[in-house]
């Protein structure tokens, strides 16, 4: 298992949890972004800067990940693509996307997008707090223990 991080919008708290987990478990981890992302000095942790552009980091992750890798992303279409390749997808709030759930999650996302396009104020997710941080850490640990 390798961890791929869609790092452009990944919260700092999540990156810190990931750095500690990668160092503790010696799992290889790559952060992918269209800007420089600093990483701690560790042979298993790397950062790759892709060209700026729509979905460039997502496309790189989809191209590189393989079955049983873990992708950290809040991007639902990216999660759907990596799940189709047999990888795991976990969002920074601790929600594990699965083959069974990703279709309905995509449908809800598309519906909300349509609502916003028609001028309806839909709001966004709540503030990122301890509950979300703990859910992420717990699911990450569970996935790493299964490898």
From Swiss-Prot:
InterPro entries recorded: UPF0178
CDD domains reported for this sequence: PIN_YqxD-like (cd18720)
Pfam family, one: DUF188
Family: Belongs to the UPF0178 family.
Protein name as it appears in the record: UPF0178 protein Patl_1318
Organism per entry: Pseudoalteromonas atlantica (strain T6c / ATCC BAA-1087)
